[in-house]
Design a protein with these regions (language model features):
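Long, low-complexity segments enriched in small/aliphatic residues
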Residues: 339-368, 372-379
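Short helix-capping/linker segments at secondary-structure and domain boundaries
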Residues: 318-336, 370-376, 486
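Structural motif
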Residues: 295-312, 319-323, 350-358
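Charge-rich, solvent-exposed alpha-helical interaction surfaces
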Residues: 284, 288-291, 313, 330, ...
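Bacterial N-terminal signal peptides
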Residues: 14-23
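Bacterial N-terminal signal peptides that target proteins for export
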Residues: 3-15
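Gly/Pro-rich cap/lid or specificity-loop segments adjacent to the active site
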Residues: 31-309, 362, 368-502
């Protein structure tokens, strides 16, 4: 069974017999990471069928489940620990420090992060340890968010609202209310500081991607003097944290803009039967979605391919310009009633795991304030979001039942935990594609202005690119900033698709 997530929340959202038995309790101070080879037990099963590099080291870092308002230890209490799964790829020669990779999501694992070490990125590999970690509640960190329900306990013939409430109850029961209360971005920021201290670095050197840029920017607000060099790629606007609807609406508009560019490219290259005319392309895509909705296709394993699968695949493949040919093939084949091995592979590889889906939903909801909407406001917002990204909203009529986060009972309201620090950090570099559907370029422009930091604009379509080896201009600028952080002017690099959609 494929796990399909709401397209506007994708890019945008063990039983608690743990009770704390999986925690260590005590006082946290100057915790160390006991590094061991990742080839040894219990770490060898962290990576599934993929064998890690023999050089890769693994370990856990214990951090407090909850912090004081300033990130300190809570005295007088026996505070349970969370154990963060960590990896280290040691520097090849003289060690100068650690480069921490902060993953996106929320909910994406971050151990053994992918970096292309071709030149110029190889310069980092020589003298910097590459550090990855699974954030609290995610992946191999303990405890992990778990919202799964045994098949026998999943009720049939219930309303959508009841189905959401069942999942919420499973999240809280399996993970524990106290764990969930401290699973959000507020604690994740303080975890970064504990990681820096455990690594023995005087200041933080890091690259953050997508949602990880939210953590990095909040860290820069709270610990400006602890920043050495931090690159934020695919930028979240932290000033939108007090207005969830605004960032959702901005993201929806950006997705539609990217769809329009995809359709124009598709028509020009004759890759799929979409028109370069915006209205006509949306109409054609709606016809295909309706066709799949009423008469789903079937893959070689007997799995159904409906409109939900195409929407999920579309929102996934629109993110990267290099994936557009695959999306075009899917649109063309589905229009013809065909499902090739290539598209089956794309559908299966784009599936979001249940664990990632759980973590994304829970962390987003915990971070949001307790927002109770009237029926009129809820309908108005849903209509605005549907109008902003009309390509995937083909069904007539909108449901009026509350969304997952509106029904979610445990909130921390991340915006209320922010610190107004008058000191601006140096050493930040913001990176963004000009046409990024999920973290729009305007986010990066606003954050660069807020922190008086340079902005690297990639003139093209995509989402996150730093240190992947696919754009020499970007990698040179990022590596230069990481090795020798200094205030520079804004930078522009040409990216995939620049100028070829018109």
């Amino acid at each position: 069974m494929r796990v399909i997530m709401d397209p506007l929340r994708r890019t945008l959202m063990t039983l608690f017999l743990f009770l704390f038995s999986f925690f260590i309790s005590g006082t946290v101070s100057a915790q160390r990471i006991e590094w061991q080879s990742c080839m040894t037990s219990p770490y060898s099963d962290w990576f599934g069928v993929e064998s890690p590099s023999p050089e890769l080291l693994c370990g856990y870092l214990s951090v407090p489940l909850k912090y004081t308002d300033t990130g300190g230890d809570i005295s007088g209490e026996n505070i349970p620990f969370v154990r963060l799964a960590m990896t280290k790829l040691p520097a090849k020669s003289k060690h100068k420090g650690s480069l921490l990779i902060i993953s996106g999501g929320p909910g994406l694992p971050g151990i053994n992060p992918y970096i292309n070490f071709d030149w110029p990125v190889t310069n980092l590999r020589e003298s910097w340890d590459i550090i990855g970690f699974d954030p609290r509640g995610v992946g191999k960190s303990i405890p992990a968010i778990n919202c799964q329900q045994p098949d026998g306990k999943r009720s049939e013939n219930i309303t959508d609202k009841q189905r959401i409430l069942q999942r919420i109850n499973a999240c809280i029961h399996n993970t524990g209310a106290e764990v969930i209360r401290h699973i959000g971005s507020n604690e994740a920021v303080y975890d970064i500081e504990r990681i820096r201290q455990a690594l023995g670095d005087k200041q933080l050197t890091a690259v953050a991607y997508s949602y990880g840029t939210q953590i990095a920017a909040l860290y820069a607000e709270r610990f400006p003097s602890s920043i050495r060099s931090v690159v934020l790629d695919g930028v979240v606007d932290i000033d939108d944290l007090n207005d969830n609807f605004t960032w959702q609406l901005r993201q929806a508009h950006s997705y539609q803009e990217t769809f329009d560019r995809f359709a124009t490219w598709c028509a020009r290259t004759k890759s799929c039967p979409l028109s370069s005319d915006r209205i006509q392309a949306i109409h054609q895509f709606h016809e295909l979605l309706l066709k799949l909705h009423h008469s789903p296709l079937t893959d070689s394993r007997g799995e159904s391919i409906s409109s939900d699968e195409l929407i999920s695949l579309t929102t996934e493949l629109l993110l990267w310009r290099s994936s557009w040919p695959t999306l075009a093939t899917a649109v063309r084949q589905f229009s013809q009633g065909i499902v090739s091995n290539e598209i089956e592979t794309a559908l299966n590889s784009s599936i979001v795991s249940e664990e990632i889906s759980d973590a994304l939903g829970v962390i987003l909801c915990v971070d949001q304030g307790d927002e109770q909407l009237t029926l009129e406001v809820r309908k108005s917002r849903k209509k605005a979001l549907a109008d902003a990204f009309p390509a995937v909203n083909f069904k007539r009529g909108l449901s009026d039942f509350p969304e997952f986060c509106e029904l979610w009972p445990i909130h921390r309201d991340l915006n209320k935990t922010r610190l107004n620090n008058a000191v601006l950090p140096s050493g930040l570099l913001f990176v963004s594609h000009k046409y990024d559907p999920t973290t729009p370029w305007i986010n990066a422009r606003k954050m660069a202005d807020k922190f008086s930091a340079p902005l690297l604009t990639i003139n093209g379509d995509g989402h996150t690119l730093a240190l992947t080896g696919t754009n020499l201009c970007v990698d040179e600028a990022v590596v230069r900033h990481l090795l020798l952080p200094r205030k520079t002017e804004d930078i522009t690099c040409q990216g995939s698709g620049a100028g070829d959609t018109n």
